[in-house]
Regions:
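N-terminal Rossmann NAD(P)H-binding glycine-rich loop of SDR-like oxidoreductase domains
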Residues: 2-24
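Conserved Rossmann-fold NAD(P)-dependent oxidoreductase catalytic core, especially the SDR/UDP-sugar
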Residues: 29, 83-125
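Substrate-positioning beta->alpha
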Residues: 129, 176-190, 201
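Short, polar loop motifs at secondary-structure junctions
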Residues: 30-37, 151
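NAD(P)H-binding glycine-rich loop region in Rossmannoid oxidoreductase-like domains
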Residues: 36-91
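A conserved pocket-lining segment of Rossmann-fold NAD(P)-dependent short-chain dehydrogenase/reductase
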Residues: 163-180
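Conserved beta-loop-beta element that borders a ligand/cofactor-binding pocket
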Residues: 135-155
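Glycine/proline-rich active-site loop of Rossmann-fold NAD(P)-dependent oxidoreductases
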Residues: 140, 154-162, 192-201
């Protein structure tokens, strides 16, 4: 059975992922900077950038739920991935909680959601930083999977118990809506983490 580490687990997505892992009876440890807010009892209290190879050596799957929003911290969306890739055990998987802004608008892969007219200006710096992190991740020597949520990512939305996995292009349901709850996103993350699918690949998740 795989042993899981959720990094930056105190955030909303991180907590949902931990809850889903534990509901399945899986072996879960969390890495958090401050007091643990998750259901997990196995805890490493350390900043992501202070984690060492020894800290993560026993984990088969590391789920990175790190996020940074302050302008001065946005480059950490790249440096955090570089750090984790450098310290993970040779055969470990790295699953990254990603963003929707870098999803492409069509199969040409020339323009992303963040470049579209309706994308909120306030979120463009974050979306760009996360896109740069993904671009760097593609070059790193690590077994990664990057999971982009739907354009409308609903923190407190209901758990419907279903989702659709798509590729690098933003897709919608039959009503033209790209939406997903954090709860169903967490289910998708854990399903992928336990399935061994989508190696060195970015996928998108929506209802």
């Amino acid at each position: 059975m795989n042993i899981f580490l959720v990094v930056a687990a105190n955030g909303k997505a991180g907590q949902k992922i931990v809850t889903e892992l534990m509901a399945r009876g899986l072996d879960v440890t969390v890495a958090v900077r401050q007091a643990n807010k998750t259901q997990a009892s196995q805890v490493i209290i350390k900043d992501l950038f202070d984690l060492t190879a020894a800290d993560v050596s026993n984990f088969d799957v590391v789920i990175d739920a790190f996020g940074a929003w302050a302008p001065e911290a946005l480059p950490q969306h790249t440096s955090s991935l570089e750090h984790l890739a450098a310290i993970l055990a040779p055969n470990a998987r790295l699953l990254v909680v990603g963003g929707a802004g870098s999803l492409y608008l069509d199969a040409s892969h020339t323009a992303a959601l963040k470049d579209s007219d309706g994308f909120p200006e306030a979120f463009k710096p974050l979306a760009s930083a996360m896109g740069e992190g993904l671009a760097r991740l593609r070059t790193l020597d690590v077994d990664w999977t990057y999971l982009s949520p739907a354009a409308d990512f609903v923190a407190d939305g209901e758990k419907k118990g279903h989702y659709v996995i798509e590729g690098e292009v933003l897709t919608t349901d039959d009503k033209g809506v790209s939406q997903l709850s954090y709860a169903d996103y967490a289910t998708a993350v854990v399903d992928i983490a336990t399935s061994g699918r989508y190696h060195r690949e970015r996928v998108s998740v929506r209802w």
